[in-house]
């Protein structure tokens, strides 16, 4: 049963975190007649620009969150970012609020330690060897045990912040400091992972819905400093590797529970599949599905959350996405070259509407469909490269 927005019968969805992914979720929810409320720590965030109303609050602050949730009384609370008081979400769920997909899933996946221990120690999924450290002394010992090269990440961060690879002993102190600087919330610990010489990495978008579990065609992606730069779909895989990735994705998403879309990341080495991470919500690499699939990851998430059916997920065309990044720190920006980007065959452009910029901030994405993935990747890079993010004088 779906009510009428802005009436007593309204079905209300509250987004906690209002970036570009939250914006698309809000748009899809509104297509189903859902009343939407956007919450983030800064004003004019992308999802706030399309929601029915919005609130600015520090979502790590329990009291601030409680005030807004009591005021709005949402039917669905949908976390989109890591910097949320997830312990309070567990309390809210016990009080009868519905957290998407579940409060436990949100709590575990906001913290790399929680999800890694669940995957590797409880579910026996293959992962890179790992250690955790709270002090520089523990960190140095962990690096020695894991060996070089190794990958360093804060246990809580977003968009690749604080991630680096230690290749030589000279990198150790820099990596520790960088990880601490990139941490979000209370996540002061870091994870030290053995470097896997993988052939490629994928995101397997996995949907838990009223009719079971479904998978999108695998998405390949390229990262720099842990932050996504481009993605493409489908990623060619052997049948054996794909079947194993789907098996592991089902195991981890069943353990987390609830309904919704999960972005499950894997390293692939031949036919061997290593679990990396999981996000219980749409994934940045999955933005390519806005061009390639009959239902985007955002529509799939909203359908699953609302208990609506999800028939066959179809790949309509090979395609790719490529990010548009800011170069400077500015209070207001404008975009030039959009018309040139849209002249690239098969291209679409999404500008996120972020209120300000900083170096490397993701401000938009170019989406391209083409007869094959290689062509789509080249054209997406070309389209994104034509867009310039410029300060408003």
Curated annotation (Swiss-Prot):
Leader sequence residues: none
Binding positions (Mg(2+)): 265, 277
Upper lineage: Bacteria, Pseudomonadati, Thermodesulfobacteriota, Desulfuromonadia, Desulfuromonadales
Protein keywords: ATP-binding, Ligase, Magnesium, Metal-binding, Nucleotide-binding, Purine biosynthesis
Biological function: Involved in the de novo purine biosynthesis. Catalyzes the transfer of formate to 5-phospho-ribosyl-glycinamide (GAR), producing 5-phospho-ribosyl-N-formylglycinamide (FGAR). Formate is provided by PurU via hydrolysis of 10-formyl-tetrahydrofolate.
Pfam families listed in its UniProt record: ATP-grasp (PF02222), PurT_C (PF21244), RS_preATP-grasp-like (PF22660)
This protein's record includes keyword Transport: no
Oligomer and partners: Homodimer.
GO-annotated biological processes: 'de novo' IMP biosynthetic process
Domain of life, per lineage: Bacteria
Location of the ATP-grasp domain: 117-306
Gene Ontology cellular component list: cytosol
Residues engaged in binding N(1)-(5-phospho-beta-D-ribosyl)glycinamide: 20-21, 80, 284, 354, 361-362
Gene this chain is encoded by: purT
InterPro entries: ATP-grasp (IPR011761), ATP-grasp_carboxylate-amine (IPR003135), ATP_grasp_subdomain_1 (IPR013815), PreATP-grasp_dom_sf (IPR016185), PurT (IPR005862), PurT/PurK_preATP-grasp (IPR054350), PurT_C (IPR048740), Rudment_hybrid_motif (IPR011054)
Pathway it works in: Purine metabolism; IMP biosynthesis via de novo pathway; N(2)-formyl-N(1)-(5-phospho-D-ribosyl)glycinamide from N(1)-(5-phospho-D-ribosyl)glycinamide (formate route): step 1/1
Enzyme class: ligase
Designated name of the protein: Formate-dependent phosphoribosylglycinamide formyltransferase
Gene3D superfamilies attached to this UniProt entry: 3.40.50.20, ATP-grasp fold, A domain, ATP-grasp fold, B domain
Ligand binding (ATP): 112, 153, 158-163, 193-196, 201
Reaction equations catalysed: N(1)-(5-phospho-beta-D-ribosyl)glycinamide + formate + ATP = N(2)-formyl-N(1)-(5-phospho-beta-D-ribosyl)glycinamide + ADP + phosphate + H(+)
A single MF term (Gene Ontology): phosphoribosylglycinamide formyltransferase 2 activity
Segments forming a coiled coil: none
E.C. numbers: 6.3.1.21
Family recorded in the similarity comment: Belongs to the PurK/PurT family.
């Amino acid at each position: 049963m779906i009510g009428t927005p802005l009436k007593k019968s309204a079905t209300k969805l509250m987004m906690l975190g209002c970036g570009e992914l939250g914006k698309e979720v809000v748009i899809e929810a509104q297509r189903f007649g859902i009343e939407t409320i956007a919450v983030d720590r800064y004003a004019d965030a992308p999802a706030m620009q399309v929601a029915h109303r919005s609130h600015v609050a520090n979502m790590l602050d329990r009291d601030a969150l409680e005030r807004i949730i009591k005021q709005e009384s949402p039917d669905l609370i949908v976390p989109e970012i890591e910097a949320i008081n997830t312990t309070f979400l567990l309390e809210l769920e016990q009080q009868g609020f519905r957290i998407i997909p579940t409060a436990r899933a949100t709590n575990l996946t906001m913290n790399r330690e929680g999800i890694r221990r669940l995957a590797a120690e409880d579910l026996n999924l293959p992962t890179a060897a790992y250690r955790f450290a709270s002090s520089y002394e523990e960190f140095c010992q962990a690096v020695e045990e894991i060996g070089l090269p190794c990958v360093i990440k804060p246990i809580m961060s977003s968009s690749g912040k604080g991630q680096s690879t230690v290749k030589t002993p000279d990198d150790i102190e820099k990596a520790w400091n960088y990880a601490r600087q990139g941490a979000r919330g209370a996540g002061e610990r870091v994870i030290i992972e053995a470097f896997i010489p993988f052939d490629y990495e994928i995101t397997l978008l996995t949907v838990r819905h009223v009719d079971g579990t479904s998978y999108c065609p695998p998405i390949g992606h390229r990262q720099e400093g842990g932050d996504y730069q481009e993605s493409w779909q489908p990623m060619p895989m052997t049948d054996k590797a794909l079947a194993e990735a789907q098996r592991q994705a089902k195991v981890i998403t069943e353990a987390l529970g609830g309904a919704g879309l999960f972005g499950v990341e894997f390293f692939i080495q031949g036919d061997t599949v290593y679990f990396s991470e999981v996000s219980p919500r749409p994934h940045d690499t999955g933005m390519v599905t806005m061009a390639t699939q009959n239902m985007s990851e955002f529509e799939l998430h909203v359908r699953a959350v609302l208990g609506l059916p999800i028939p066959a997920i179809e790949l309509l065309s090979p395609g790719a996405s490529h990010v548009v990044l800011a170069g400077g720190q500015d209070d207001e920006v404008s975009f030039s070259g959009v018309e040139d980007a849209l002249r690239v065959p098969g291209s679409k452009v999404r500008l996120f509407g972020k209120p300000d910029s900083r170096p490397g901030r993701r401000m938009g994405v170019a989406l391209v469909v083409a007869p094959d993935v290689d062509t789509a990747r080249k054209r997406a890079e070309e389209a994104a490269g034509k867009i310039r993010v410029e300060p408003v004088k």
